[in-house]
């Protein structure tokens, strides 16, 4: 991290002080640059090309050194379009890696890979910047205690709990509620943990990025009236941008998150949507740099690139970065090298189900498909573990009986199975929950449910104490007391 002087005078005053090279070759987003002997820039240094194209338009392209080729040549990858660049143009070595603004000034704003604001809300305070390439925290700095990161979302906390400083994979197709779940997590971390969030849009559609921004403004996650009170910083490297930008935008978002963890000592949520596009961009860059492709055409450095990003996402003694990563699975093939490499780093998976979304059960988290390494008695305690297992067993039995119910009806089941089905349907509905960020759409106030309350609620359903209550009393409520109150209201309405 660097604290820059308030008056940003010219970084280099005379031509002698500059390290200037010239473009020798341009192949798409890849440039070869020749520097004077003995003045070669380091790997990952940022190079800046400034000048005018043949029509007289101003050009300002930032590149990152990827290879030293020998004969005073370096190969660099551009972070923006290379249209208008010509051979012989001057290239200035900044003598440092790409650096981006960090700290409170980033909240409520949208940035590109270079840390430049792209939301037309004016400049950002760049007195505090940080290089995007950093080492992962040393072993001695890590917080080795396994603790649960309480989200306030019942289905997540009970059945697939997140680890504080862990990495979670979010699987789901279009329209099943990924964005709303992400926004609720951003809202809850700010409310319950006093934390902030950073959203890294890696290869997202421009429309999706815009929709997310608008929805965050509507739900209050981004405060338009007082931008400093916002709870999230957004960093976008969209689909239409060169592979260099898409490959590095994840690191830009991570660098902003690291500052909140290390300097502000906060709990941070880092969203990466989509981690597959990070791998895909790396694959494109690898081919452009002339490396021999590996399995299925991916880059030979796939594990290294993934590791260098994932190892920086962790808990230290100061604070934590808990990362939620949307994972696209190409052709639904889980053995594809991209998702397979991602799985090795994940502590939990949250799978969103289209079937549940169709039933109107939100969040549409699949209780049987979602997993977590944290769901062990020695970590969460016997009570939590037992309750979660019994909930899963009840739902699994209901799933097995559904074919029989569809053909023969409920009446053909044994008394015991009918009771299981009734409880499973109550559990299924009780796993739904009204969200704070959806208040503006649904009209029902959001609910944050603590872990102890969640466990108590499901224990009461499993024990049979609430068998007499109607199913709809459990739908879209917070804790179990609200369900019993709702049942009494429904009873009163009938009379």
Swiss-Prot record:
EC id: 7.1.2.2
Molecular function per GO: ATP binding; ATP hydrolysis activity; proton-transporting ATP synthase activity, rotational mechanism
Subcellular location: Plastid, Chloroplast thylakoid membrane
Entry-linked PROSITE patterns: ATPASE_ALPHA_BETA
GO cellular component terms attached to this protein's record: chloroplast thylakoid membrane; mitochondrion; proton-transporting ATP synthase complex
Membrane topology note: Peripheral membrane protein
SMART domains: AAA
UniProt catalytic activity: ATP + H2O + 4 H(+)(in) = ADP + phosphate + 5 H(+)(out)
Top-level EC class: translocase
Any GO BP: proton motive force-driven mitochondrial ATP synthesis
Principal cellular location given in the protein's record: plastid
Binding annotation for ATP: 172-179
Record keywords, A-Z: ATP synthesis, ATP-binding, CF(1), Chloroplast, Hydrogen ion transport, Ion transport, Membrane, Nucleotide-binding, Plastid, Thylakoid, Translocase, Transport
Record-stated family: Belongs to the ATPase alpha/beta chains family.
Function: Produces ATP from ADP in the presence of a proton gradient across the membrane. The catalytic sites are hosted primarily by the beta subunits.
SUBUNIT field: F-type ATPases have 2 components, CF(1) - the catalytic core - and CF(0) - the membrane proton channel. CF(1) has five subunits: alpha(3), beta(3), gamma(1), delta(1), epsilon(1). CF(0) has four main subunits: a(1), b(1), b'(1) and c(9-12).
Protein name per Swiss-Prot or TrEMBL: ATP synthase subunit beta, chloroplastic
Lineage: Eukaryota, Viridiplantae, Streptophyta, Embryophyta, Tracheophyta
């Amino acid at each position: 991290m660097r604290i820059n002087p308030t008056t940003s005078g010219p970084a280099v005053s005379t031509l002698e002080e500059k390290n200037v090279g010239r473009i020798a070759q341009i192949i798409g987003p890849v440039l070869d640059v020749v520097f004077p002997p003995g003045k070669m820039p380091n790997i990952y240094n940022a190079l800046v090309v400034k000048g005018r194209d043949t029509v007289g338009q101003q050009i300002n392209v930032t590149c990152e050194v990827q290879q030293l080729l020998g004969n005073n040549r370096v190969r660099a990858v551009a972070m923006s379009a290379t249209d208008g660049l010509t051979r012989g143009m001057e290239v200035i070595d900044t003598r440092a890696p790409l650096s981006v603004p960090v700290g409170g000034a980033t909240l409520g704003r949208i940035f590109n890979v270079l840390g430049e604001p792209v939301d037309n809300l004016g400049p950002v305070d760049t007195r505090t910047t940080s290089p995007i390439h950093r080492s992962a925290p040393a072993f001695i700095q890590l917080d080795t205690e396994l603790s649960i990161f309480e989200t306030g979302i019942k289905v997540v906390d009970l059945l697939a709990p997140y680890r504080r400083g862990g990495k979670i994979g979010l699987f789901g197709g279009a329209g099943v509620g990924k964005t709303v779940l992400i926004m609720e997590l951003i809202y809850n971390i700010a409310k319950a943990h006093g934390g902030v969030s950073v959203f890294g849009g890696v290869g997202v559609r421009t429309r999706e990025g815009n929709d997310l921004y608008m929805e965050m403004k509507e739900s209050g996650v981004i405060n338009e009236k007082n931008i400093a009170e916002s709870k999230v910083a957004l960093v976008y490297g969209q689909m239409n941008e060169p592979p260099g930008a898409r490959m590095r935008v994840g690191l830009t978002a991570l660098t902003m998150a690291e500052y909140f963890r290390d300097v502000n000592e906060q709990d941070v949520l880092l969203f990466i949507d989509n981690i597959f596009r990070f791998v895909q961009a790396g694959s494109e860059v690898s081919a452009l740099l002339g490396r021999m492709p590996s399995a299925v055409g991916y880059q030979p450095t796939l594990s290294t690139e993934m590791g260098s990003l994932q190892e920086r996402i962790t808990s230290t003694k100061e604070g934590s970065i808990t990362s939620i990563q949307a994972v696209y699975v190409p052709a639904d093939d889980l053995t594809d090298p991209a998702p397979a490499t991602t799985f090795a780093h994940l502590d939990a998976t949250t799978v969103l189900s289209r079937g549940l979304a169709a039933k109107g059960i939100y969040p549409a988290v699949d209780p049987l498909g979602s997993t977590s390494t944290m769901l062990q008695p020695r970590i969460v305690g016997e009570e939590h573990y037992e309750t979660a297992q019994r909930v899963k067993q009840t739902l699994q039995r209901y799933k097995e009986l559904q074919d029989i119910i569809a053909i023969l009806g409920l009446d053909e089941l044994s008394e015991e199975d009918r009771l299981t089905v009734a409880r499973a349907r109550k559990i299924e509905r009780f796993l739904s929950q009204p969200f704070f960020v959806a208040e503006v759409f649904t009209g029902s106030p959001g609910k944050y449910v603590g872990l102890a309350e969640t466990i108590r609620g499901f224990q009461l359903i499993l024990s049979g104490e609430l068998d007499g209550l109607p199913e709809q009393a459990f739908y879209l409520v917070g804790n179990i007391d609200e369900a019993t109150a709702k049942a009494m209201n429904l009873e009163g309405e009938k009379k």
